[in-house]
């Protein structure tokens, strides 16, 4: 998977760097792990921290095993995912190392189905807190219609692609889908992936 390839790359190039893994799907849980819950006849993933910060060099195998154990089951509660990422970044040592959040997503932000403005706005607000703490946020969309082409202004862009730009550091001052601030990169900016 792309995430395991990323872990391999970081482990080889920067073994002292630390990586945490967060999954986002259904209800929010403050437990660390890969837990699920039942709702009627269906089983869903919690949105939770799967692995706390772990050294990439010595912990790569454990990190990759945690990623490989993840299976889709539930909505795309990106707001909860970004809130967990924000708590990790806020709790990380201020050791002068660059802090980065990479959000991989396969769908529209929601707690049920379709594009949910409330979930998108909460994810954008959490991302703003991450960016305000000096971290860079990258977004990677693996969904139909994903188009990370750099665009400024964001008029005429699908909600999902606009959202991906606003969560990313392309728009450092974005606080919601309607309060985007200006592009961090005038003239079009950078792509999300």
What kind of region is each of these model predictions?
Residues 4-14, 25-83, 108-111, 133, ...:
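Short, charged loop segments at secondary-structure junctions
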Residues 7-14, 86-97, 128-129:
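Surface-exposed acidic, glycine-flexible loop patches that form ligand/cofactor-binding
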Residues 6, 18-23, 100-104, 136-138:
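Soluble periplasmic/extracytoplasmic beta-strand elements of cell-envelope proteins
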Residues 75-76, 80, 87, 98, ...:
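VWA/integrin I-like adhesion module and closely mimicked acidic/polar interface patches used
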Residues 1-21, 115-120:
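…and closely analogous acidic/polar surface helices at protein-protein or active-site interfaces
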Residues 19, 46-47, 154:
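Low-complexity, intrinsically disordered short peptide segments enriched in small/polar/basic residues
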Residues 15-19, 94, 176-177:
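Secondary-structure boundary/capping residues
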Residues 57-62, 91, 121, 125-128:
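Short amphipathic secondary-structure patches
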């Amino acid at each position: 998977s792309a995430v395991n390839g990323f872990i391999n790359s970081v482990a080889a190039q920067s073994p002292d760097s630390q990586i945490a893994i967060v999954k986002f799907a259904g209800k929010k849980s403050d437990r660390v792990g890969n837990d699920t819950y039942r709702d009627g006849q269906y089983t869903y993933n919690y949105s939770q921290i799967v692995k706390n910060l772990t050294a990439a060099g010595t912990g790569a195998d454990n990190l990759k095993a945690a990623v490989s154990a993840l299976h889709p089951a539930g909505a795309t509660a990106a707001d909860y995912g970004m809130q967990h990422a924000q708590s990790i970044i806020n709790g990380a040592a201020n050791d002068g190392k660059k802090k980065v959040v990479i959000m991989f997503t396969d769908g529209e932000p929601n707690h049920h189905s379709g594009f949910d403005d409330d979930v998108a706005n909460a994810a954008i607000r959490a991302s703003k807190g991450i960016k305000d703490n000096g971290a860079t946020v990258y977004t990677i969309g693996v969904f139909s219609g994903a188009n990370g082409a750099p665009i400024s202004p964001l008029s005429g862009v699908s909600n999902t692609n606009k959202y991906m730009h606003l969560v990313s550091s392309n728009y450092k001052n974005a606080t919601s889908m309607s309060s985007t601030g200006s592009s961090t990169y005038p003239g079009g900016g950078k792509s999300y992936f």
